[in-house]
């Protein structure tokens, strides 16, 4: 398995992974209608042009996992930038492999480099139900908050 930064040639496969993620998670956002693939396309290009990080896991020329993260201004300190993970997804048949761990390791290395270069101050990951087996504390993260969802 290869873990690498995603590029413009991965677009179609990345879109497929985002669709699979969207279908797999229990998001209340599904009430909004179909996934806006044009927006996903624009967001992906924005990320790979420097607004974040896109990492993929590839096996036998197929993308089997993805991490997308986007730089945002800190809500309290607008001159500080935070890298927020948007999604972490591994295809179900590859979840008992090292794909997720290896992508997270690469995410940390790239994000740590961004911290060292003063591009960002901190970076985040979100522990969704599909990632409940990962011990983020052992990877150096500390719990900051929990997210609860209500409404449509």
Where are these regions (language model features)?
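Conserved acetyl-CoA-binding loop of GNAT-fold acetyltransferases
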Residues: 135-146
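Conserved GNAT-fold acetyl-CoA-binding loop/helix
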Residues: 22-42
């Amino acid at each position: 398995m290869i873990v690498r930064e995603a590029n413009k040639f991965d677009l179609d496969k990345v879109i497929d992974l985002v669709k699979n993620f969207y279908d797999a998670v229990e998001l209340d956002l599904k009430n909004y209608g179909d996934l806006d693939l044009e927006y996903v396309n624009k967001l992906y290009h924005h990320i790979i042009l420097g607004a974040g990080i896109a990492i993929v896991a590839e096996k036998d020329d197929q993308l089997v996992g993805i991490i997308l993260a986007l730089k945002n201004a800190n809500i309290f300190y607008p001159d500080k930038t935070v890298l927020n993970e948007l999604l972490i997804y591994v295809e179900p048949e590859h979840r008992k492999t090292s794909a997720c761990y290896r992508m997270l390791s690469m995410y940390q290395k790239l994000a740590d480099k961004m911290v060292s270069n003063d591009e960002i101050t901190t970076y985040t990951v979100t522990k969704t139900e599909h990632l409940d087996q990962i011990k983020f504390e052992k990877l150096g993260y500390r719990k900051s908050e929990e997210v609860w969802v209500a409404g449509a």
